[in-house]
Amino acid sequence: MSIFSGIWIPLVTPFSRGAVDHDALRTLIGAYRAAGVSGFVALGTTGEPAALDEAEQAAVLATTLAAAGDLPVLVGVSGNQTASLRERIAQLNEVPVAGVLISAPYYIRPSQAGLIEHFASLADLSEKPLVIYDIPARTGVRIELDSLLTLAAHPRIQAIKDCSGSPETTLALILDGRLRVLAGNDDEIFTTLCMGGAGAIAASAHVSTERFVALYRALTEGRLDAGRALWHALVPLVGAMFAEPNPGPVKAALAAQGRIENELRAPMTRASDALHLRLKQLAAA
């Protein structure tokens, strides 16, 4: 069975007095392991990698790998120059990550032919499985279904974090069966799992983690009524977690629980006071 299933946590990077708080990161990972998650993403969007220098990124990845134990760790990679990303892939070939999560090149909006060439070039070099991260709202370019089906033929490309917002694309990929489809938009977790998706990479699951794991198990075991009840209870939390730019709300919720400091690096900002109060209430529920 593929490792790319279940509930994965795209970890925040905790800060304390401006520095990465590795102790808080270890504690979070330990709690999520105990809650039954299937894996972790280090240096994904929620982890503020653009705010970290190269040494900090390496240290965060090392801490995550050590704390994750036997659970798999994906590492996020992004950029808009194929050559520089190939250098990063070569570096990661020497690191014991379970795979690499790669988004489309941002800002420059390449053609579909360019996207196929880009991902294939990285997959050819990688010794690790690749998970395509389709998030057009952030990159400015959508990876079309035909392109994804072409890339699915590459043996290194094994899964997709699906933030396309297209239920037609999601279902087509699930029916094709070659890529493991992981929901990337948290408000689509229920529908993706009901369609036969493999799991989710869910920022909201930093809080009420056990409920997200229970939701996954209920739906994959065919217990629809139980899954629906769990999902309905989670909907307010999911909505609040994305009411303002990620990861501000996630960090606010964790800070409300006393698990991390409520710190981000500019230009990202803390959640508003009103949202912080709402998240505190939801996190305590």
Regions found by a protein language model. Give the residues of each.
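C-terminal alpha-helical cap/extension of soluble enzyme domains
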Residues: 2-14, 31, 35-37, 194-197, ...
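Active-site beta->alpha loop and helix N-cap motifs at the rims of alpha/beta catalytic domains
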Residues: 2-142, 150
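Short glycine-rich loop/turn motifs that provide flexible caps or phosphate-binding loops at active sites
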Residues: 5, 38, 43-46, 75-78, ...
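Short, flexible micro-motifs
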Residues: 9, 42-50, 79-82, 162, ...
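Poly-acidic low-complexity segments
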Residues: 21-24, 93, 166, 223, ...
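Alpha-helix N-capping/helix-start residues
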Residues: 22, 54, 145, 221-224, ...
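A general structural signal for well-ordered alpha-helical segments in protein cores
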Residues: 25, 57, 61, 85, ...
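Catalytic alpha/beta core domains of metabolic enzymes, predominantly
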Residues: 124-125, 136-242
